[in-house]
Amino acid sequence: MGAYSPAPIIDEITRQNILNEIVYPVFEGFKKEDFEYTGILYIGLMIDDKKPSVVEFNCRFGDPETQPLLFRINSDIFDLFYFTALKKISDYKLEWKSKTAVSVVLALSLIHI
């Protein structure tokens, strides 16, 4: 398992598909249901031919997916959380390092008979 960032598979067409087909409808559903949400919303996706499919939603960071993102954030992550908690995220400027980051997970399963 592992993750990398930035993901070259996410070109502008794919990004717009993700926003229009998944992210915006979720926010519209929150608004329609009068559901106020503050925090992390992790959307696990599979992408085939620039078309996203949702694998999972989580109200937490995904692991190992978050690891390369944290390496690339060039802003104070405390400020990100702080502005999120205050519901002033639009006042926050998230800056990214231009470098690529990769995380790799080595896992072993032992079966004892």
Residue ranges and their predicted role:
Residues 26, 38, 81-89:
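Oxyanion-binding "anion nests"
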Residues 39, 76-77:
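Secondary-structure junction/capping motif
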Residues 66-76:
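Helical (often loop-to-helix) elements that flank the catalytic cores of nucleotide-handling enzymes
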Residues 111-113:
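Conserved small/polar residues in nucleotide/adenosyl-binding loops
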